[in-house]
Amino acid sequence: MSKEELLQELAGAVITCKKDAVLAAVEKAKGELDPSEIIEKGLAAGMNEVGVLFERGKLFLPHVMMAADAMTAGVEALKDLMPEGSASSKMGVIVNGTVEGDVHDIGKSIVSTMLQSAGFEVHDIGRDVPIKNFVEKAKEVNADMIGLSALMTTTLPGQRDVIELLKEEGLRENVKVMIGGAPATQAWADKIGADCYAENASEAVAKAKELLA
């Protein structure tokens, strides 16, 4: 099989939510492709497509959850090929979540999975997360970075509020902040004083490595 065919098979298995098919595709791809490529261009590509179909009303939440489970199983199957994952806390500790008032979960979950597979210790605290919970969790796990996702214009201010609370608590100097989500932009990141903006999951991994190196 060509590289493209392997990647298509990986993505297709995630889209159809077939865990067995995902594991079989991962097994097949292991000897041919780099683990990060299997995740980013195969599994995550499939999950991104699921997200698009969900947003368009073509798929429903149970399908999304099953696809996410299938993708997670695929990532787990690659753990033994990712030596840096065993020293994840050395790469950096990241708290990741979707801000209060926002129930979107897919993009944030993909980012968490990919950060984890890149070797970071990730604490995904879910969606619709109150501002103070981000800061409390960061203190609890001694986080190096907080990832803030917002998928609606109305919830964007929550990203700014987390940064303000970090300042009030005297933690801002020690905790980097990365923002993302459809309405977020580099200009918004600059305005609220975030350390970086990531347009997608691959960029989130690259920027986290850059900031926490």
From Swiss-Prot:
Gene3D superfamilies: Cobalamin-binding domain, Methionine synthase domain
Domain named B12-binding: residues: 91-213
CDD domains in the record: corrinoid_protein_B12-BD
Xref: PROSITE patterns: B12_BINDING, B12_BINDING_NTER
SMART domains, alphabetized: B12-binding_2
Matching Pfam families: B12-binding, B12-binding_2
Any one Gene Ontology molecular-function term assigned to this protein's record: methyltransferase activity
Gene Ontology BP terms: methanogenesis
Binding positions for methylcob(III)alamin per the UniProt entry: 104
Pathway: One-carbon metabolism; methanogenesis from dimethylamine
B12-binding N-terminal domain ranges (all copies): 1-90
Top-level taxon: Archaea
UniProt KW Metal-binding keyword: yes
Keyword vocabulary terms for this entry: Cobalt, Metal-binding, Methanogenesis, Repeat
Function description: Acts as a methyl group carrier between MtbB and MtbA.
Family, similarity comment: Belongs to the methylamine corrinoid protein family.
Protein name as annotated: Dimethylamine corrinoid protein 1
Origin species: Methanosarcina acetivorans (strain ATCC 35395 / DSM 2834 / JCM 12185 / C2A)
